[in-house]
Amino acid sequence: MRRRDKEITSREEIDSIIRAADVCRLAFARDNEAYLVPVSFGYDGGSIFFHTAPRGRKLEFIAANNRVCFELEANVELRANERDACDWTFEFESVIGYGTVSELTSDEEKIGGLNQIMRHYSGREWEISGQAAATTRVWKIEIESLTGKRSSEKPQITQMDADQPD
């Protein structure tokens, strides 16, 4: 990472960003073509899970090259400067990772992967039918590397700051 001052090295902080993210963006490549797609996801601390329909473009890219790059972000906030157009920016925390995609094929694995996704969004495990598992393709990204970035430190508000009039 070029800006080491923005790098997040703590795995605990990186995991926290992943758990706070709403969307995972997957980047695929084949031949001389790239494909980026947002997906809902689950995370178990070592792998990311996502699902697809039985057919589609993602599957074509996975078949050609099962290596992926992925991105997640959390705590995104626009910081506007009403006097200087060149001083608008975003505060954010993000994670970029690389890994290898494999398909979960048994109903037990697929239900486990789908529950990782549901747990991410709902905080609980669900009863997922064998029929749902049979008609859904579920995938696991075995994470090989992760890097985190924080755009800037969010200012800490002290009691003295809070007492000052605007």
Where on the chain are the PLM-derived regions?
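Extreme N-terminal tail/first-helix region
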Residues: 1-19
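Charged, gly/pro-rich active-site loop segments
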Residues: 2-5, 75-155
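Short Pro/Gly-enriched beta-strand edge/turn motifs at strand-loop
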Residues: 20-24, 121-124
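Short beta-strand segments
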Residues: 21-54
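A short mixed-secondary-structure module that forms the rim of ligand-binding clefts
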Residues: 42-78
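A short, structured loop/turn motif at beta-sheet edges
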Residues: 62-64, 104-108, 163
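Short, low-complexity, charge-dense intrinsically disordered segments
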Residues: 156-166
